[in-house]
From Swiss-Prot:
GO MF annotations, alphabetized: anthranilate phosphoribosyltransferase activity; magnesium ion binding
GO BP: any one term: L-tryptophan biosynthetic process
Subunit record text: Homodimer.
Cofactor needs: Mg(2+)
Protein name listed in UniProt: Anthranilate phosphoribosyltransferase
Pathway the protein contributes to: Amino-acid biosynthesis; L-tryptophan biosynthesis; L-tryptophan from chorismate: step 2/5
UniProt enzyme class: transferase
InterPro entries recorded: Anthranilate_Pribosyl_Tfrase, Glycosyl_Trfase_fam3, Glycosyl_Trfase_fam3_N_dom, Glycosyl_Trfase_fam3_N_dom_sf, Nuc_phospho_transferase
Amino acid sequence: MDIKSALARIVGHLDLSTEEMRDVMRQIMTGQCSEAQIGAFLMGMRMKSESIDEIVGAVSVMRELADKVELKSLDGVVDIVGTGGDGANIFNVSTASAFVLAAAGCTVAKHGNRAVSGKSGSADLLEAAGIYLNLTPTQVARCIDSLGIGFMFAQSHHSAMKHAAGPRRELGLRTLFNMLGPLTNPAGVKHQVVGVFAQALCRPLAEVLQRLGSKHVLVVHSKDGLDEFSLAAPTFVAELKNDEITEYWVEPEDLGMKSQSLHGLAVDNPQASLELIRDALGRRKTENGQKAAEMIVLNAGAALYAADHAMTLAQGVELAHDVLHTGLAWEKLQELGAFTAVFKVENEA
C-alpha cells in the first residue's frame, strides 16, 4: 500500500492492517514520501487513533531499520524508559534508576534521547554528567558487557527517523512517533518498564509488546499524570508476564513507601537534574534529595521486578532501597563516564 492509498483510508476513519502499516512506514523511513504526506499521515492517524495492528507494524519497521546493538544474551537485560510528554518536568527518574539497576547486578540497555517537550532528556542528563554519547553499536555493547550498563542514543540508532523530523517539528503535537521510541530498543530487550503519557495507552502498548515477543513488561501511567511510578498518587500498571496481561493499580504504601508530594522534584535544565540525582544517589543532604531517592527506589524496584531480578514489586523496591544506600549507583555512573571517554578519544582521533 502506498501513502496516498493509506491517507484515503485514514480520512474515512478506517484502520490499516499490520502489513499495510509496514508498507507505509517503510516508504516514510526510506525517504519516499513528501513532508506534506508525512504530516497528513501523522495527523490523520492521531485523529483516527492508532490501532494495535498499526503500532505493531510501525514498531516492526523501526526495529528492522535500526542500527542494532548485538549482545551475547538478552536474558534479564532490561530497559526503563518513558514516552515523555507528561508536562511535569520531573528530574530524570528512569535514567537515575538505570544506574541503581546496574549496581544491583542487572544488565541494562538504556535507550533514550534529548528532551522534546521537557527540560531534560536522558541524553541531556548523561551529557551533563560527562558521559560520551556518540558511540557505535559495538562500543555500546562493550559498555554493557563490561559495566552492566550502556546508553543507546536514539538518534544514533534510528537514522531513518530523519525523514519524519521536519513534519514532527512543524506539527508540534504528539504523534505516533512519540509512542515508538520506548518500543524500539536497539538491543531488542525483552524486559522493560515503559512509562506512557496517558493511561489509555497502557493496555494497548502491553499488547503491542506481547505481539512482538517481550517477556516481562510493566507499562505504567500515574494518576497525577506521570509517565512513571509516582510517590504522590496511585499508578496504573498493565503487566505482561508469562504471555498474559494483567491490569492493576499500585499505591506507594503497597510497596512499603510513604505517599508524598512531588514538590521540589521538577527541574529547569539537565544540570539541575544531575545535581538532584547526585544528592539522591549520594548522601541525601537535602529534603528534595531524599524525596528524589525514594522516587528512584520506587521505579528502580519496578524494573528489578520486570528484569526478574526480584519475585514481586515489593521485593524489587526493597532491593532497590538497599542498593541505592550503598552509593554504588553513583559510582556506576562515574564508571560509564570514564569508560566512554576512551571511546571519545578513539572516535575523534
